[in-house]
């Protein structure tokens, strides 16, 4: 029987998504399970292997029909060695040989990919980036993930560390970032950055209906900032406009460096839509040199939470 399916896995700090994906990029079946990231990485990988078995059983899929497993993981990776060196979202994953571990548990070929790269691969294959030769896919969530497609292929760089747009410095000596440095883009445009900047403005005395959302037992969230912005709260709207401007400045810098034809924006922060994207597009059109001669296509991602698993599965189809 032809091996027509691949398994794509997207490991997040909160949840793990596991999907059966066919050769056209369609998701045949998917399941979500909690990560419980504080556990030993061997336990997490064991849960992943068990989840794969449960998903295959639920869809009556035999091992013989599966080409392999694509493992999308966060952190600093060595793809050929199959190792997670370090990952803020997986604190016990230090020099973790996850590929050999999952292979031994499942008996299937396993291929490792950065989670943000996997999302970019998915969007390029069957999402908003179909047909584009050169693009950037940015995922705005708790942090900022990004992946570059150059000449129709994901760009890994010399040491599998390319694409860390979130840790390019936007403001010298600016806000502290989770990486330990100051002024990174992630500290300004991620969900965490939105919350921190809003809380700082409230502490400084800005008047806002968000005051009620910043109390003990009722922590401030980026969703609350968005909802209050929709209702017309001035501070909340200013925060999202400023977030869009910061994002647009970073994207214009990338365009001036790489002359990309398309930028895709995904993740839960991007669900703010025009409130975020319009100020970003304005900055790009003002600051990107190519904007004077060629249109810059900035699009919202299409695949949502499926982008990572679809892209991870594509890494299998590309190799087996």
Language-model-detected regions and their locations in the chain:
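Short hydrophobic alpha-helix segments
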Residues: 31-33, 88, 158
């Amino acid at each position: 029987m032809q091996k027509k399916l691949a398994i794509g896995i997207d490991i997040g700090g909160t949840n793990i998504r596991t999907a059966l994906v066919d050769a056209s990029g369609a998701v045949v079946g998917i399941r979500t399970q909690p990560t419980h990231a504080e556990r030993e990485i061997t336990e997490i990988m064991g849960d992943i292997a068990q989840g794969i078995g449960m998903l295959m059983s639920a869809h009556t899929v035999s091992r013989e029909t599966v080409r392999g497993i694509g493992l999308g993981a966060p952190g600093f990776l060595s793809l050929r060695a199959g190792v997670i060196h370090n990952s803020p979202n997986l604190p016990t994953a230090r020099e973790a040989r996850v590929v050999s571990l999952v292979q031994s548990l499942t008996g299937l070929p396993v291929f490792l990919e950065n989670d943000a790269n996997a999302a970019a691969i998915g969007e390029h294959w069957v999402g908003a980036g179909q047909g584009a030769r050169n693009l950037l896919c940015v995922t705005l969530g708790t942090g900022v993930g990004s992946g570059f497609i150059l000449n129709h292929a994901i760009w890994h760089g010399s040491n599998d560390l390319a694409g860390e747009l979130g840790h390019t410095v936007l403001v010298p000596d600016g806000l502290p970032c989770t990486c330990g440095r100051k002024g990174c883009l992630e500290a300004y445009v991620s969900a965490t950055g939105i919350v921190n900047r809003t809380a700082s403005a409230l502490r400084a005395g800005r008047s806002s209906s968000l005051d009620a959302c910043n109390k003990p037992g009722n922590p401030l969230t980026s969703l609350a900032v968005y909802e209050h912005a929709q209702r017309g709260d001035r501070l909340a709207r200013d925060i999202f406009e400023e977030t869009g401007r910061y994002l647009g400045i970073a994207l214009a810098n990338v365009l001036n460096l790489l002359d990309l034809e398309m930028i895709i924006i995904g993740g839960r922060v991007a669900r703010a839509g025009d409130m975020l994207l319009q100020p970003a597009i304005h900055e790009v059109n003002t600051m990107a040199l190519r904007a004077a001669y060629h249109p810059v296509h900035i699009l919202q991602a299409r695949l949502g939470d499926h982008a990572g698993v679809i892209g991870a599965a594509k890494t299998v189809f590309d190799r087996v």
